[in-house]
Amino acid sequence: MSRAGNGGRQRIKTAKGRSASSIKWIQRQLNDPYVRKAQAEGYRSRAAYKLIELDERFHFLRGAKRVIDLGIAPGGWTQVVRRVCPQAAIVGIDLLPTDPIDGAIILQMDFMSDEAPAQLAEALGGPADIVLSDMAANTVGHQQTDHLRTMALVEAGCLFASEVLRPGGTYVAKVLAGGADHGLVAELKRLFTTVKHAKPPASRKDSSEWYVIAQGFKGRPEAAGADGE
């Protein structure tokens, strides 16, 4: 329990078998206001508030009819979409098993597989209005390696979005700062009319993550090229 004089922060007793890093993580979770808020409001993760804050600033969710959530587990972002767009068709995809969410279709598969774009479009009933991605690669503890691995995922997500979005659609994705993000932004500007970025208040201050909000999808380049053949 917390004691007077520590600013309301909780401390946990050390236990055999716990590493210093795991104790630090548990301590941070116990004292994180977003974790407590998520538990109180029924969200599966604190990441839900990142999407809420991004949408409050950029207004991309309201009116969406078809939404894809890449890397849905544990499901916090899809929960937000359900509350903001209760009539929307939502399909989430992840390699990890994810507990069901009312009103959402969840596919346990690799979004980079050849079958994924067609399978998700079929489940949605048409092209997507929005593709969301809060994915990050498993970290190895080396900052540049972690950055490059996550950027490869984001770029794959961008390619996927270009295959399933309707013209005028939106792609929102997590990015880790580190150098390779410049090439991604250039590609997004080629595919979308507006590309903005932000770090929502719910992102931890010591995190290198930020989010890209690409709106106004111009349409598939190959489709435009086919007309001229």
Curated annotation (Swiss-Prot):
Top-level class of the enzyme under EC nomenclature: transferase
Keyword Methyltransferase: yes
Name of the gene: rlmE
Positions contributing to S-adenosyl-L-methionine binding: 75, 77, 94, 110, 134
SS bonds (residue pairs): none
Enzyme Commission (EC) number: 2.1.1.166
Catalytic activity, as annotated: uridine(2552) in 23S rRNA + S-adenosyl-L-methionine = 2'-O-methyluridine(2552) in 23S rRNA + S-adenosyl-L-homocysteine + H(+)
Classification lineage: Bacteria, Pseudomonadati, Pseudomonadota, Alphaproteobacteria, Sphingomonadales
Primary localization: cytoplasm
Catalytic residues (UniProt): 174 (proton acceptor)
InterPro entries: RNA_methyltr_RlmE (IPR050082), RNA_MeTrfase_FtsJ_dom (IPR002877), rRNA-MeTfrase_E (IPR015507), SAM-dependent_MTases_sf (IPR029063)
Family to which the UniProt record says this protein belongs: Belongs to the class I-like SAM-binding methyltransferase superfamily. RNA methyltransferase RlmE family.
Location relative to the cell: Cytoplasm
Any one of the GO CC terms: cytoplasm
Residue ranges crossing the lipid bilayer per the database entry: none
Protein name: Ribosomal RNA large subunit methyltransferase E
Superkingdom of the source species: Bacteria
Keywords of this entry: Cytoplasm, Methyltransferase, rRNA processing, S-adenosyl-L-methionine, Transferase
Species name: Rhizorhabdus wittichii (strain DSM 6014 / CCUG 31198 / JCM 15750 / NBRC 105917 / EY 4224 / RW1) (Sphingomonas wittichii)
Purpose of the protein: Specifically methylates the uridine in position 2552 of 23S rRNA at the 2'-O position of the ribose in the fully assembled 50S ribosomal subunit.
Region listing for Disordered, in residue ranges: 1-20
HAMAP family linked: RNA_methyltr_E
